């Protein structure tokens, strides 16, 4: 009855007043109303470290966290984790903001949007003494302790298990008396604060993707909570911040699976609710090795530099470990929000298939607004075309024929100058052409080209079509050698007359005459 009361208060008050009063209904309802939003609203976070360009794996984490929140109408929080001062890179915070804005992953809260859970930068939170306060609470509870061991002592604790060197701290500082600890603290001895892990039994944690995972407690080291420089460790700061910010779902790479039981122990020591864990599969290259900087496309910025468009990158990254029920592949960001179900994330490593990304990028380029495409393509066209061409027409030719923008120069460089080419290119089985027939056709068509005044595509094509009809030839029998002569390429972004319109009459005649000489 009480469960029903909390769902439908008016009905409950009317139908069962005794149950209402006996169970303290009004107090329960007041608490429920006050906590309704925080109890029901999904809150995810992206907490990058400002250490340089954004790795594809981090972008996927941000995207999945965003999609999980937005699919359920929840909040997506940006938090900057800059507690590792040694790895901090100047300007990296700007890269984070630029990447988030560029990909459309707009945060609801963050350093620039404080909604009452700030500060959202860990170094600022650390400066307030926040993490130390919670670490000291654990010390008072007996769940943490000061450790004064130096590098030499820690080195002596290492041992080899199954051919692998491991280090399990032996808790020697846990046995220090309170007086001894205080004396050493007063003397200013360097120290850390460690969590007091149980040494017997097991710890089980649940992950949405990987299910229940159980580890022996004896395998879990007394992890450091506060480092000797006073900064919290990544693990500890995460737990504190996620709890205080009301994070309901934690999305991260599966390399953190081994840390999850330690996280749970900290949550339990504080008596806090454990969030939903969503660990994403590893991203590998085509050789099934971890995607690294050496691959040349491990970061979002790398991909932009290589001519990939943001929408294609986001679409592709979404499919690195997740697939929709209908096997569809092209999604806008709003469509991803609608379709994304994190329960369908795979356990298996996701392969970064650059060929598939190129294909997908080509699909987005085809759909791009022609004016937007022209603006993006112009710098690539001007790399190889130095004369005054109709660049808009050339852009129209290549838009449906490229996969990335850097494909453009090699596709159009012949407009500037015919490359050296093998005369065997005139041989085409389907067009029934060879070097001899091509030479004859070019000699026959040259007077037609010389007499033609209007070199725009339609009139030019009409004149050549009339020539073809008059001679009783097939279209390709004439157009193949003509296109080869004016381009010197097997593959071109347009037909012979379209190319001739771009280069003009004078250049066309020059190239056809050169081809006749080459074939003679």
Mark where each language-model region is.
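Conserved phosphate-binding loops in nucleotide/dinucleotide-binding enzymes
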Residues: 120, 226-227, 245-257, 284-316, ...
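Short, often N-terminal, low-complexity regions
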Residues: 17-27, 482
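Active-site cores that bind ATP or allylic diphosphates and position pyrophosphate for catalysis
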Residues: 140, 145-279, 285-291, 324
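Charged substrate- and nucleic-acid-binding regions of tRNA-handling and nucleotidyl-transfer enzymes
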Residues: 458-519
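Single conserved hydrophobic/aromatic residue that forms the stacking wall/gate
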Residues: 1-15
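Residue-level signal for inorganic ion chemistry
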Residues: 55, 65, 96, 138, ...
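Small-residue-rich helix-loop
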Residues: 370-471
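N-terminal Rossmann-like or analogous alpha/beta NTP/dinucleotide-binding catalytic cores
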Residues: 39-162, 260-272
């Amino acid at each position: 009855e009480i469960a029903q009361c909390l769902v439908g208060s008016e009905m409950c008050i009317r139908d069962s007043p005794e149950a209402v009063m006996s169970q303290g209904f009004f107090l329960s309802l007041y608490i429920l109303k006050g906590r309704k939003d925080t109890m029901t609203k999904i809150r995810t976070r992206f907490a990058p470290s400002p250490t340089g360009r954004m790795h594809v794996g981090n972008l996927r984490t941000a995207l999945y966290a965003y999609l999980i929140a937005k699919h359920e109408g929840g909040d997506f929080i940006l938090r900057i984790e800059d507690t590792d001062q040694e790895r901090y890179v100047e300007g990296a915070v700007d890269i984070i903001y630029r990447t988030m804005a560029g990909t459309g992953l707009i945060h609801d809260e963050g350093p620039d949007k404080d909604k009452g859970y700030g500060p959202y930068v860990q170094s600022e939170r650390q400066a307030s003494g926040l993490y130390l306060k919670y670490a000291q609470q654990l010390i008072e509870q007996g769940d943490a302790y000061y450790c004064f061991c130096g590098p030499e002592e820690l080195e002596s604790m290492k041992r080899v298990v199954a051919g692998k060197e491991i280090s399990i701290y032996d808790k020697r500082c846990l046995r220090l008396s309170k007086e001894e600890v205080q004396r050493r603290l007063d003397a200013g001895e360097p120290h850390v604060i460690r969590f007091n892990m149980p040494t017997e039994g097991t710890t089980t944690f649940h992950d949405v993707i990987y299910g229940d995972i159980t580890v022996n407690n004896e395998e879990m080291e007394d992890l450091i909570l506060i480092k000797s420089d006073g900064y919290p460790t990544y693990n500890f700061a995460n737990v504190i911040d996620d709890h205080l910010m009301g994070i309901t779902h934690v999305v991260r790479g599966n390399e953190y699976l081994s840390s999850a039981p330690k996280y749970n122990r900290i949550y339990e020591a504080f008596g806090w609710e454990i969030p939903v864990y969503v660990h994403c599969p590893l991203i590998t290259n085509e050789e099934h090795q971890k995607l690294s900087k050496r691959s040349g496309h491990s970061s979002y910025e790398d991909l932009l530099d290589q001519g990939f468009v943001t929408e294609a990158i986001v679409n592709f990254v979404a499919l690195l470990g997740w697939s929709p029920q209908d096997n569809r592949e092209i999604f806008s960001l709003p469509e991803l929000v609608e379709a994304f179900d994190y329960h369908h994330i795979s356990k298996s490593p996701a392969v970064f298939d650059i060929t598939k990304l190129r294909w997908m990028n080509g699909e987005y380029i085809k759909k791009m607004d022609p004016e937007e495409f022209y603006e993006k393509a112009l710098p690539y066209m001007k790399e190889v075309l130095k004369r005054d061409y109709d660049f808009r027409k050339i852009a129209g030719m290549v838009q449906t024929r490229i996969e990335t923008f850097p494909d453009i120069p090699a596709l159009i460089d012949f407009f500037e100058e015919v490359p050296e080419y093998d005369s065997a290119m005139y041989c085409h089985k389907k067009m029934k052409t060879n070097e001899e027939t091509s030479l004859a056709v070019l000699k026959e068509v040259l007077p037609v080209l010389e007499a033609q005044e209007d070199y725009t595509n339609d009139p030019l094509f009409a004149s050549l079509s009339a020539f073809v009809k008059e001679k009783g030839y097939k279209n390709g029998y004439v157009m193949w050698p003509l296109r080869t002569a004016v381009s010197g390429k097997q593959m071109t972004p347009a037909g012979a007359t379209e190319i001739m319109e771009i280069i003009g009459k004078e250049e066309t005649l020059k190239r056809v005459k050169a081809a006749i000489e080459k074939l003679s």
